[in-house]
From Swiss-Prot:
Lineage: Bacteria, Pseudomonadati, Chlorobiota, Chlorobiia, Chlorobiales
GO terms under cellular component: ribonucleoprotein complex; ribosome
Protein name in UniProt: Large ribosomal subunit protein bL28
Annotated source species: Chloroherpeton thalassium (strain ATCC 35110 / GB-78)
Record key words, sorted: Ribonucleoprotein, Ribosomal protein
PANTHER family: 39S RIBOSOMAL PROTEIN L28, MITOCHONDRIAL (PTHR13528), LARGE RIBOSOMAL SUBUNIT PROTEIN BL28M (PTHR13528:SF2)
GO biological process: translation
Similarity remark: Belongs to the bacterial ribosomal protein bL28 family.
SUPFAM superfamilies the UniProt entry points to: L28p-like
Record keyword Ribosomal protein present: yes
A GO molecular-function annotation: structural constituent of ribosome
Length: 74
């Protein structure tokens, strides 16, 4: 399962985990990706998408019009 948000484009990034003794270890930070079913009112159908938590908040505030435009392009 790829961990990339289709709306915001968020994906993994690399960084350091730093202990109390200031030891650095390389690690990979994953985005908070959720699999969601969203009702598209314009198309009268459900779609399954992988969205980040930030994208879910954007859709709840602005509606599904942006998501519908993005999915029609694919």
């Amino acid at each position: 399962m790829s961990k990339v948000c289709i709306l915001t484009g968020k994906k993994h990034q690399y960084g350091n985990t730093v202990s109390h003794a200031n030891n650095h270890r390389r690690t990979r930070f994953e985005p908070n990706i959720q699999a969601k079913r969203i009702w598209l009112e314009e198309e009268k159908r459900w779609v399954k998408v992988k969205l980040s938590a930030k994208a879910i908040k954007i859709i709840s505030k602005r509606g599904t019009a942006e998501l519908a435009k993005l999915l029609q392009g694919k």
